[in-house]
Design a protein with these regions (language model features):
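Bacterial N-terminal signal peptides
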Residues: 23-32
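A short alpha-helix/helix-coil micro-patch that ends at or immediately precedes a cysteine
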Residues: 37-77
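N-terminal secretory signal peptides that target proteins for export/translocation
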Residues: 1-16
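Disulfide-stabilized extracellular recognition modules
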Residues: 105-156
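Short, surface-exposed glycine/acidic/tryptophan-bearing loops
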Residues: 66-113, 126-128
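Second-shell loop/turn segments in exported
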Residues: 36-37, 53-61, 98-106, 110-113, ...
Length: 156
């Protein structure tokens, strides 16, 4: 499934102070724990391999997008079905120009990436030249199924 949202940077307000403090603590925790999980790093590498194969630059990992994606992949695994977040900007406390989201599940990260690339809408997000940042969350459920969330962003 894919979801795209576009906005101007002037239409967003800053996150309340409490959310900003919580986000700072979460970022510090992720950095202290070694940033992204090995599965997330692998899934991100697969995205960047797909981009490179199509003449596009690699996307940089955005820790805030990673935290959102990782949390949401756990939600999907717990819920047991795929569904998009209703507000892609929720949890981002700074300006953005464009956001995109891919969600999927499967038996391996490679299988999911191949399915994304075979789907025009998912492929469009992965190969969108305007995106410059990514966060990928991966959760493996008790049955061994991988739940992947790819969050894309164009920063001003």
């Amino acid at each position: 499934m894919t979801h795209r949202t576009e906005s101007s940077t002037t239409s967003r307000r800053r996150a309340p102070r409490r959310l900003a403090v919580l986000a700072a603590v979460a970022v510090a925790l992720v950095v202290a724990l070694g940033a992204c999980t090995p599965e997330s790093n692998r899934a991100t590498a697969l995205v960047n391999e797909s981009r490179a194969a199509n003449g596009l630059p690699a996307l940089g990992v955005n820790i805030d997008l990673y935290l959102i994606a990782q949390g949401y992949s756990g939600t999907l695994a717990n819920d047991g079905y795929l569904h998009h977040r209703t507000n892609l900007a929720e949890g981002l406390g700074y300006p953005w120009v464009k956001l995109g989201e891919n969600i999927g599940k499967g038996g391996s990260l490679e299988q999911i990436q191949n399915a994304f690339m075979a789907s025009p809408a998912h492929r469009d997000n992965i190969l969108d030249p305007s995106f410059d940042a990514i966060g990928v969350g991966v959760t493996r459920d008790a049955n061994g199924v991988y739940w992947v969330v790819q969050e894309f962003m164009n920063q001003p």
